[in-house]
Amino acid sequence: MSSTTAQTLPDGVVTLADHEFHARSLLDEAVWAYFNGGAADELTLRANAQAWQTIELLPRVMRQLSGGHTRVNLLGREWPHPILVAPMAYQRLAHPHAEQATALAAAALGAGLVLSTQASTLLEDVARTVL
């Protein structure tokens, strides 16, 4: 994979809505529609969005936090946190280095990557990128 200049997010891109707005400004309309849509009648897409609306965080102030961590052992490997990038098909539509770029970004953040069965890049090529 050849190197390209890394892009940084503009100031103010923080929330999911901010990221969606920024992504839409960068992608062709048909590509945006593909990545922003869901399968068939999009029931699962809407149900997922609704489920996230029900989550509330309860702040706990003045608590003892020493010894706490987010590490998790998964598939015989210790990860710094339980975050994996979900499988996404046809990433080359959004970036010339496709899944290889996503794998590098995930690795830089200590996250795992689940490769789609409809990836734009061979599994072996993605593995060579990060191993």
Positions of PLM-derived features:
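Active-site mouth loops of central-metabolism enzymes
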Residues: 84-96
